[in-house]
């Protein structure tokens, strides 16, 4: 099994793809077992419960063999699982200094900055970075190695393209204080400059200069960010921290 360490080159999409291909695939399950059965805890099985009821954690193939071997002793059982042949585990979020809402999916090797907010249904892929005080709104997608700066808002349903499929050596970068409207799409390799605003529903195919507003399909510069725009797009600090 190949483990992608902190020293591995996440800038190379082919290295990430190799890791995914060669990583040991996992189908972890949780089994609730009722019956007169003795289950010994091993390196492959984690067991809780009492004489006639057990909760067992392990890989699907191991747990299924256990159930088949003790079929005559089991009255009822139920299996719960949420993935199949998964190559990348989810990020351990329990000690992050950020707000992570239920239903967010954040894969391993992601960096989440202080006071960031990840809303329900957001998906953040391997190698992405979310800066301090930034919000990834509901159902937004941050692709592999997407770089999100500080004080950024990525609107609901927006898509920040990743470096995988099609492979790209250059990640999408949103610099500090950028606002991306709902359902906008930022394509591979695009850099959105400091303080820029991407209007809702736009498709951004080329770099966006700092402090500009872009809109449309494909997105074009429509104005320079002014005081009125800053007022309409300012972040709410009470939602952070």
Swiss-Prot record:
Pathway: Amino-acid biosynthesis; L-lysine biosynthesis via DAP pathway; LL-2,6-diaminopimelate from (S)-tetrahydrodipicolinate (acetylase route): step 1/3
Cross-referenced PROSITE patterns: HEXAPEP_TRANSFERASES
GO molecular function: tetrahydrodipicolinate N-acetyltransferase activity
Source taxon at top rank: Bacteria
EC number of the protein: 2.3.1.89
Keyword DNA repair among record annotations: no
Gene3D superfamilies, per database record: Hexapeptide repeat proteins, Malonyl-CoA ACP transacylase, ACP-binding
A Pfam family assignment: DapH_N
Record NCBIfam families: DapD_Ac
Family from the record: Belongs to the transferase hexapeptide repeat family. DapH subfamily.
Family matches, as HAMAP family: DapH (MF_01691)
Protein name per Swiss-Prot or TrEMBL: 2,3,4,5-tetrahydropyridine-2,6-dicarboxylate N-acetyltransferase
Organism of this sequence: Thermoanaerobacter sp. (strain X514)
């Amino acid at each position: 099994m190949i483990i992608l360490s902190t020293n591995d080159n996440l800038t190379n999409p082919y290295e990430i793809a190799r890791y995914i291909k060669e990583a040991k695939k996992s189908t972890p399950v949780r089994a609730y077992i009722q019956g007169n059965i003795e289950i010994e805890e091993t390196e492959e099985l984690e067991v809780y419960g009492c004489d006639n009821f057990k909760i067992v954690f392990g890989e699907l193939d191991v747990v299924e063999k256990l159930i088949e071997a003790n079929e005559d002793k089991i009255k009822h059982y139920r299996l719960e699982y949420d993935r199949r042949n998964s190559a990348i585990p989810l990020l351990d979020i329990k000690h992050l200094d950020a707000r992570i809402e239920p239903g967010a999916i954040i894969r391993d090797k992601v960096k989440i900055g202080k006071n960031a907010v990840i809303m329900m249904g957001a998906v953040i892929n391997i190698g992405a970075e979310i800066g301090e005080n930034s919000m990834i709104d509901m159902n937004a997608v941050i692709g592999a190695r997407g770089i999100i700066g500080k004080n950024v808002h990525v609107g609901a349903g927006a898509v920040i393209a990743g470096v995988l499929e099609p492979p790209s050596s250059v990640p999408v970068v949103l610099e500090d204080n950028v606002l991306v409207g709902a359902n906008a799409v930022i394509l591979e390799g695009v850099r959105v400059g400091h303080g820029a605003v991407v209007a809702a529903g736009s498709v951004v195919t080329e770099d966006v200069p700092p402090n500009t507003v872009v809109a449309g399909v494909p997105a074009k510069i429509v104005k320079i960010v002014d005081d009125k725009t800053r007022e309409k797009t300012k972040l709410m600090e009470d939602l952070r921290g």
